[in-house]
């Protein structure tokens, strides 16, 4: 959201594991149900000079362990800029999948597994208005940044059912045939 008309959306959250399990049809096994409880969010149209201060401040204040930063356009430069300012592991990623299909396909899971904080309507009025007024007809929406960000949280943290801590998730040998 440096010079264009896009917004910067960033969210901090805690991942919780339910005591219940659900059947995963793809993996043919029961897996724990994971939830992301949103703790803080930034949604602004300010330029990089401002967001390179506000986003790292939020990440550090919330005690975030891993920061996923989309590096499609200017995101790679933004990630390099804030990497030195945060205590979390910085993980840039390229999002090549179709944004519209990702948001629509995962919308039911995002609604069920991402929990907003109590009183988020007053605390984050712009995000609340945007998310609750989002239309399935994409051209009717001026922006889709919060929806894309929430879908990304689901895809990166909840969809695979991996409950290992970040420090253990990257250990060991990965074998690919």
Predicted regions span which residues?
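Short glycine-centered helix-capping/turn motifs at secondary-structure transition points
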Residues: 112-116
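Conserved beta-strand -> loop -> alpha-helix junction used to position metal-binding or nucleic-acid-contacting
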Residues: 87-111
């Amino acid at each position: 959201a440096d010079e264009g008309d896009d917004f910067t959306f960033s969210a901090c959250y805690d991942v919780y594991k339910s005591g219940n399990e659900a059947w995963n049809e793809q993996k043919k096994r029961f897996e724990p149900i994971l939830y992301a409880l949103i703790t803080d969010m930034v949604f602004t149209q300010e330029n990089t000079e401002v967001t390179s201060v506000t986003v790292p401040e939020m990440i550090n204040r919330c005690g975030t362990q891993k920061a996923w930063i989309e590096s499609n356009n200017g995101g790679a430069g933004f990630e390099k800029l804030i990497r030195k300012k945060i205590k979390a592991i910085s993980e840039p990623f390229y999002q090549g999948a179709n944004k519209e299909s990702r948001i629509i396909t995962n919308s039911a899971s995002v609604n069920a597994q991402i929990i907003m904080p109590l009183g988020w309507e007053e605390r984050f009025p712009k995000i609340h208005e945007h998310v609750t007024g989002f239309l399935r007809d994409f051209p009717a929406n001026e922006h889709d940044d919060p929806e894309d960000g929430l879908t990304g949280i689901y895809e990166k943290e909840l969809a695979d059912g991996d409950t290992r801590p970040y420090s253990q998730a990257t250990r060991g040998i990965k074998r690919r045939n």
